[in-house]
Amino acid sequence: MFHDPRFWTALAFVLFFVIFGRKLWVAITGHLDARADSVRHDLDEAARLRREAEQMLEDANREREKTLAETQAMLARSEAEAAGLAERARKDAEAAAARYEKMAQDRIHAAERSAIREIQDRAAQIAVAAARDVVSTRLTESPDIAATLIDKGIDSLPEALRRSAA
Protein backbone atom coordinates (compact mmCIF):
# COMPACT_ATOMS: atom_id res chain seq x y z
CA MET A 1 0.00 0.00 0.00
CA PHE A 2 2.77 2.50 0.84
CA HIS A 3 4.64 1.34 -2.16
CA ASP A 4 1.72 1.61 -4.50
CA PRO A 5 1.83 4.78 -6.61
CA ARG A 6 -1.94 4.93 -6.70
CA PHE A 7 -2.01 5.33 -2.94
CA TRP A 8 0.41 8.22 -2.99
CA THR A 9 -1.41 9.81 -5.89
CA ALA A 10 -4.71 9.53 -4.05
CA LEU A 11 -3.15 10.86 -0.83
CA ALA A 12 -1.57 13.80 -2.70
CA PHE A 13 -4.89 14.50 -4.35
CA VAL A 14 -6.75 14.46 -1.01
CA LEU A 15 -4.09 16.57 0.75
CA PHE A 16 -4.08 19.02 -2.15
CA PHE A 17 -7.84 19.45 -1.84
CA VAL A 18 -7.69 19.65 1.96
CA ILE A 19 -5.04 22.36 1.85
CA PHE A 20 -6.09 24.27 -1.24
CA GLY A 21 -9.69 23.13 -1.55
CA ARG A 22 -11.17 26.03 0.35
CA LYS A 23 -9.15 28.57 -1.60
CA LEU A 24 -9.92 26.84 -4.86
CA TRP A 25 -13.56 26.56 -3.86
CA VAL A 26 -13.71 30.27 -2.99
CA ALA A 27 -11.89 31.23 -6.21
CA ILE A 28 -14.03 28.95 -8.38
CA THR A 29 -17.31 29.99 -6.73
CA GLY A 30 -16.20 33.64 -6.85
CA HIS A 31 -15.45 33.32 -10.54
CA LEU A 32 -18.74 31.49 -11.14
CA ASP A 33 -20.63 34.09 -9.07
CA ALA A 34 -18.95 36.88 -11.04
CA ARG A 35 -19.87 35.12 -14.27
CA ALA A 36 -23.45 34.65 -13.01
CA ASP A 37 -23.59 38.35 -12.07
CA SER A 38 -22.26 39.27 -15.51
CA VAL A 39 -24.87 37.03 -17.18
CA ARG A 40 -27.60 38.45 -14.90
CA HIS A 41 -26.45 41.98 -15.75
CA ASP A 42 -26.45 41.12 -19.47
CA LEU A 43 -29.96 39.64 -19.14
CA ASP A 44 -31.18 42.75 -17.29
CA GLU A 45 -29.60 44.95 -19.96
CA ALA A 46 -31.21 42.84 -22.69
CA ALA A 47 -34.61 43.09 -20.95
CA ARG A 48 -34.18 46.85 -20.60
CA LEU A 49 -33.19 47.16 -24.26
CA ARG A 50 -36.16 45.00 -25.23
CA ARG A 51 -38.53 47.22 -23.23
CA GLU A 52 -36.99 50.30 -24.87
CA ALA A 53 -37.34 48.69 -28.31
CA GLU A 54 -40.97 47.79 -27.60
CA GLN A 55 -41.62 51.34 -26.40
CA MET A 56 -39.92 52.73 -29.51
CA LEU A 57 -42.03 50.38 -31.66
CA GLU A 58 -45.23 51.54 -29.93
CA ASP A 59 -44.16 55.18 -30.37
CA ALA A 60 -43.38 54.58 -34.03
CA ASN A 61 -46.75 52.84 -34.55
CA ARG A 62 -48.55 55.69 -32.78
CA GLU A 63 -46.65 58.24 -34.86
CA ARG A 64 -47.43 56.29 -38.03
CA GLU A 65 -51.13 56.16 -37.16
CA LYS A 66 -51.11 59.86 -36.28
CA THR A 67 -49.36 60.69 -39.56
CA LEU A 68 -51.78 58.47 -41.46
CA ALA A 69 -54.75 60.22 -39.83
CA GLU A 70 -53.25 63.63 -40.62
CA THR A 71 -52.61 62.56 -44.20
CA GLN A 72 -56.17 61.32 -44.59
CA ALA A 73 -57.50 64.55 -43.08
CA MET A 74 -55.32 66.60 -45.44
CA LEU A 75 -56.51 64.49 -48.36
CA ALA A 76 -60.15 64.98 -47.34
CA ARG A 77 -59.61 68.74 -46.96
CA SER A 78 -57.87 68.86 -50.34
CA GLU A 79 -60.70 66.94 -52.00
CA ALA A 80 -63.29 69.22 -50.39
CA GLU A 81 -61.32 72.30 -51.42
CA ALA A 82 -60.94 70.98 -54.97
CA ALA A 83 -64.68 70.27 -55.13
CA GLY A 84 -65.38 73.79 -53.83
CA LEU A 85 -63.02 75.30 -56.39
CA ALA A 86 -64.61 73.27 -59.17
CA GLU A 87 -68.08 74.34 -58.05
CA ARG A 88 -66.99 77.97 -57.83
CA ALA A 89 -65.39 77.74 -61.30
CA ARG A 90 -68.59 76.19 -62.67
CA LYS A 91 -70.69 78.96 -61.12
CA ASP A 92 -68.28 81.62 -62.41
CA ALA A 93 -68.47 80.11 -65.91
CA GLU A 94 -72.26 80.01 -65.74
CA ALA A 95 -72.34 83.62 -64.54
CA ALA A 96 -69.98 84.69 -67.33
CA ALA A 97 -72.10 82.86 -69.90
CA ALA A 98 -75.22 84.52 -68.49
CA ARG A 99 -73.52 87.95 -68.67
CA TYR A 100 -72.47 87.36 -72.28
CA GLU A 101 -75.97 86.15 -73.14
CA LYS A 102 -77.52 89.22 -71.48
CA MET A 103 -75.08 91.51 -73.30
CA ALA A 104 -75.97 89.82 -76.61
CA GLN A 105 -79.68 90.13 -75.85
CA ASP A 106 -79.21 93.80 -74.93
CA ARG A 107 -77.39 94.38 -78.22
CA ILE A 108 -80.17 92.60 -80.11
CA HIS A 109 -82.84 94.67 -78.34
CA ALA A 110 -80.89 97.87 -79.01
CA ALA A 111 -80.58 96.93 -82.70
CA GLU A 112 -84.31 96.12 -82.79
CA ARG A 113 -85.18 99.49 -81.22
CA SER A 114 -82.83 101.28 -83.61
CA ALA A 115 -84.38 99.50 -86.60
CA ILE A 116 -87.89 100.29 -85.35
CA ARG A 117 -86.95 103.97 -84.93
CA GLU A 118 -85.46 104.07 -88.41
CA ILE A 119 -88.57 102.43 -89.86
CA GLN A 120 -90.84 104.80 -87.94
CA ASP A 121 -88.79 107.82 -89.06
CA ARG A 122 -88.85 106.64 -92.66
CA ALA A 123 -92.60 105.87 -92.43
CA ALA A 124 -93.21 109.33 -90.99
CA GLN A 125 -91.20 110.90 -93.80
CA ILE A 126 -93.15 108.91 -96.39
CA ALA A 127 -96.46 109.75 -94.68
CA VAL A 128 -95.58 113.45 -94.58
CA ALA A 129 -94.54 113.40 -98.22
CA ALA A 130 -97.69 111.52 -99.20
CA ALA A 131 -99.87 113.83 -97.13
CA ARG A 132 -98.17 116.84 -98.70
CA ASP A 133 -98.78 115.44 -102.17
CA VAL A 134 -102.40 114.58 -101.40
CA VAL A 135 -103.12 117.86 -99.70
CA SER A 136 -101.39 119.88 -102.40
CA THR A 137 -103.23 118.12 -105.21
CA ARG A 138 -106.65 118.23 -103.57
CA LEU A 139 -106.40 121.71 -102.27
CA THR A 140 -105.13 123.33 -105.42
CA GLU A 141 -108.68 124.27 -106.10
CA SER A 142 -108.89 126.39 -102.97
CA PRO A 143 -105.54 128.08 -102.29
CA ASP A 144 -106.55 129.79 -99.00
CA ILE A 145 -107.60 126.59 -97.24
CA ALA A 146 -104.57 124.78 -98.62
CA ALA A 147 -102.15 127.35 -97.29
CA THR A 148 -103.81 127.34 -93.86
CA LEU A 149 -103.81 123.51 -93.60
CA ILE A 150 -100.24 123.24 -94.79
CA ASP A 151 -99.05 125.81 -92.27
CA LYS A 152 -100.91 124.07 -89.40
CA GLY A 153 -99.59 120.67 -90.47
CA ILE A 154 -96.03 121.87 -90.70
CA ASP A 155 -96.31 123.61 -87.33
CA SER A 156 -97.65 120.44 -85.62
CA LEU A 157 -95.21 118.10 -87.36
CA PRO A 158 -92.31 118.37 -84.86
CA GLU A 159 -94.61 117.62 -81.92
CA ALA A 160 -96.18 114.65 -83.73
CA LEU A 161 -92.73 113.28 -84.57
CA ARG A 162 -91.64 113.62 -80.94
CA ARG A 163 -94.72 111.70 -79.76
CA SER A 164 -94.20 108.91 -82.29
CA ALA A 165 -90.47 108.63 -81.46
CA ALA A 166 -91.16 108.38 -77.74
Curated annotation (Swiss-Prot):
One of its GO terms (cellular component) is proton-transporting ATP synthase complex. The chain crosses the membrane at residues 7-29. The keyword Cell inner membrane applies. InterPro entries: ATP_synth_b/b'su_bac/chlpt (IPR002146), ATP_synthase_B_chain (IPR050059). It is found in: Cell inner membrane. F-type ATPases have 2 components, F(1) - the catalytic core - and F(0) - the membrane proton channel. F(1) has five subunits: alpha(3), beta(3), gamma(1), delta(1), epsilon(1). F(0) has three main subunits: a(1), b(2) and c(10-14). The alpha and beta chains form an alternating ring which encloses part of the gamma chain. F(1) is attached to F(0) by a central stalk formed by the gamma and epsilon chains, while a peripheral stalk is formed by the delta and b chains. Belongs to the ATPase B chain family. This is ATP synthase subunit b 1. It comes from Gluconobacter oxydans (strain 621H) (Gluconobacter suboxydans).
